[in-house]
Amino acid sequence: MNGDSAGNPMAGGSSAGDVDRISDLPDDLLHLILSYVSDDAAEVTRTSVLSRRWRRVWIHAQKLCFGDDRQSRWRRLANFGGFVDWAFAQRGDADIQSVIIFMSRLDSATPEQVNEWLRYAVRRVVKTFWFNACDSTLIGAWWAPPPRDHGHQLPTVELPSHGRTASINLNLSSYPFRLKLPASPAARYEALTDLSLSSAWFREDEAVAGRRTLADFISSCCPRLRKLEIIDPMRLPQLVLRAEALEELIVASTRDTQTMDVTAPNLRIFELHYFNSMTSVTSYGESIDLVVRITAPRLEEIAINNSTLEIEDNLDLRIHGLASVRRLKNLTLAMHGHNCCNTDYGLWLLNNCPNVEHIDLRLRYEMLATHEVDDLTDNRAPRLYKARSMVIDACGLDQYLVTSVWSLLLMCPDLISLRICLRGWG
């Protein structure tokens, strides 16, 4: 194959032959045919062998997925990083709607190549850019201890100062990449509405002159950000957000984060998952108290889930303006019959969300001290008269299940839908 396919690491030796009827088709029809081709970038570029004109048609594909694990077991992509470089170079300055890069091996690309891809993406990708460095080894597992710097310079993924992409997803869980945010005062991501950052090293526990924090980047550079997802952040001791447009905030596996302070007047959904620091960077195996302060007068849905939570773990939850909340999800209640632990965040939310309509909770049996319980059957216990549906996930309650469910029904006298999921019952 010759022409524009030269230099393609994926180029084969076959040709289109003497008969080339495809080249006589109009551009609109060629683009329509291309839209039905797999979004796998390797497959898309291989269409260049079909005809003379098709050698350039693939460049107009609006969604490309690059993956170093997408090759068959009989043939592996020898130069993944070079192939991505070549494909972007062939496209030039043409815009594209979506780019996904999945890198499963450390030797698939250099940090310099990764940063060049990021610079290309935020300039040319209009809708979605997703970079996923997700290894299949145990180092990427959530239960594994986090990688440590040991004084060595970690490779850096640097976000450019300006971007026009609407949705950016950076999953750096495979390798210890440090995320560097743009320090320029003029940095702007005007079009960014969705941002997801997973397993990034922020190193905000160290004072560095001129470095921009995650909170400052979001507040100053992303005026239209509506959804923020932060998963397993490392070296991020505090997250102080002031975000006018933010509507959805999801935080998971906070490791060594000790303070979250969020003021978001348009926030509708707040989710917090696996928040105890069982894999803390600085004290692996030890829990660190987490203080969560949320000011969001329009908050409608709260989901707080931690299947590993113990009574001694300390979540200091301070959410202002709970009258607007209509949905509580993934709550944990520590119960013994009709008695419920009164030091738990789950009961605190039930007591302080009088207008909640849907409740999704997990029951857990605990032997509770007398001074730590509230009797849910007591006439002075709160009543949620607007609650209409409830989902209960029960495990290990045995003979206390019926009493516990009965007490919850008393708390929600106008309930019209109840679903109970029993786990571990033979």
Question: Residue locations for each model-derived region?
Answer:
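A structural signal for leucine-rich repeat
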Residues: 119-120, 142-162, 182-190, 207-223, ...
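C-terminal closing repeat unit and adjoining cap/tail of repeat-based domains
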Residues: 3, 381, 411-426
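Structural alpha-beta junctions
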Residues: 121-127, 354-357, 410-417
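C-terminal amphipathic alpha-helical segment
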Residues: 54, 305, 312, 317-319, ...
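Leucine-rich repeat
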Residues: 2-245, 252-254, ...
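Conserved hydrophobic beta-strand positions in leucine-rich repeat
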Residues: 64-67, 99-102, 127-132, 166-171, ...
